[in-house]
Amino acid sequence: MFKFNDEKGQLKCSFCGKTQDQVRKLVAGPGVYICDECIELCNEIIEEELGISEFVDFGEVPKPQEIRHILSDYVIGQERAKKALAVAVYNHYKRINSNETKEDEVELSKSNICLIGPTGSGKTLLAQTLARILNVPFAIADATSLTEAGYVGEDVENILLKLIQSADYDVEKAEKGIIYIDEIDKVARKSENPSITRDVSGEGVQQALLKILEGTVASVPPQGGRKHPHQELIQIDTGNILFIVGGAFDGIEQIVKNRMGEKVIGFGTDNAKLKDDETYLSRVVPEDLLKFGLIPEFIGRLPVIATLEQLDEAALVSILTEPKNALVKQYKRMLELDDVELEFEPTALIEIAKEAIERKTGARGLRSIIEQIMLEVMFEIPSRDDITKCIITEKAARGEEEPQLQLEDGSIIPIKTSA
């Protein structure tokens, strides 16, 4: 090992032998010194050994078509929204790369995204999948839990803390992450005119979000909660964080109809009404969001608006079977681990989709429906070694009969009588 001091009495790195004048930093330990260059080299070696993948290289952001293609592996339908998101995300990270290289005199502004669509249409899943594609830190926040600073509730800075935690407290990586704020429509002000009284959970939250959406250096308490004097704070620049906000915006279709000067006369079928609402939803413009209750400054920070359609029966059946992480595939795999084959009759899948539509939960409610159907199956099968197959029939999906079990001898019996 190298000596700690040279002839001139200067401290030296114990590993490479460079003096303190030859390096930027020299860190002292118990009887040892290490320079910043050796620390960086050690870090590179460890990352290489462990196979740690770096976050996205912003010089090689996937093209919009590639992003949409990968989104389609996990999200069924919603092609218009996927295209809008793919373009917005590609431009966002291309902008980061451009602004960092400073080769161009033109500084590109940030394009945050507003997703409008019914419950269970895939807003959260789209945002999560985008973060997975880009391998960037990701955080989800619920707008209904937020309040203006100084009032009971969660400060907007706590959203940033979730992102920092997602990046393992690496602030530099967190500064290029994605934040999804759900239920943003719930913080709309109650009327189009500015309120005289303080609206701390509505307009007040929008006002509090303005700066971090636009880009600011925010001070975040490391443990969350309220800020206190003399407390150590984490500084994070939100200028390159992509914000995606989402909400159902119930009733915005009527605002669009009124703007377009159209009225609905008579009573149509549910399907006709659904198609009608989807048509108007796709025509939402910033003016409609203003009428709904978002403040002009907030809308101005959400230049990209993407709408999602209500999922119909066919789309829900596809969601059950087609994506890489489809629920049917997951349950089949779970029973496969117990050496049992699982079969869903096609009509059973249709019944499950109908139930989700009836409950108005969209794709989000599919898992709870299947879980209810599969409860007895998953309770019974691990204790049996004579079952080879489980069949979910149309009647079982409707709750009119129990799932059917096929035994080793080929006989088929309902699960309740199988004990």
From Swiss-Prot:
Q: Under which name does UniProt file this protein? A: ATP-dependent Clp protease ATP-binding subunit ClpX
Q: Which residues bind ATP?
A: 118-125
Keywords of the record, alphabetical order, are: ATP-binding, Chaperone, Metal-binding, Nucleotide-binding, Zinc
Could you name the Gene Ontology cellular component terms for this entry?
HslUV protease complex
Q: What is the lineage of its organism?
A: Bacteria, Bacillati, Bacillota, Bacilli, Bacillales
Q: Name one Pfam family in it.
A: AAA_2
Spell out the Gene3D superfamilies in the cross-references: 1.10.8.60, ClpX chaperone, C4-type zinc finger domain (6.20.220.10), P-loop containing nucleotide triphosphate hydrolases (3.40.50.300)
Keyword Membrane in annotation: no
Task: Supply the PANTHER family for this chain.
Answer: ATP-DEPENDENT CLP PROTEASE ATP-BINDING SUBUNIT CLPX-LIKE, MITOCHONDRIAL (PTHR48102:SF7), ATP-DEPENDENT CLP PROTEASE ATP-BINDING SUBUNIT CLPX-LIKE, MITOCHONDRIAL-RELATED (PTHR48102)
Physiological role: ATP-dependent specificity component of the Clp protease. It directs the protease to specific substrates. Can perform chaperone functions in the absence of ClpP.
Q: Its Gene Ontology biological processes?
A: cell division; proteolysis involved in protein catabolic process
Give a yes or no for keyword Nucleotide-binding in this entry. yes
The ClpX-type ZB domain covers which part of the protein? 1-54
**Highest taxon, organism lineage:** Bacteria
Listed under subunit, the entry gives:
Component of the ClpX-ClpP complex. Forms a hexameric ring that, in the presence of ATP, binds to fourteen ClpP subunits assembled into a disk-like structure with a central cavity, resembling the structure of eukaryotic proteasomes.
> Which family does the entry's similarity section mention?
Belongs to the ClpX chaperone family.
Locate the residues binding Zn(2+).
Answer: 13, 16, 35, 38
The terms under GO molecular function for this entry are: ATP binding; ATP hydrolysis activity; ATP-dependent protein folding chaperone; protein dimerization activity; unfolded protein binding; zinc ion binding
According to the UniProt entry, the coiled-coil residues are: none
| HAMAP family cross-referenced by the UniProt entry | ClpX
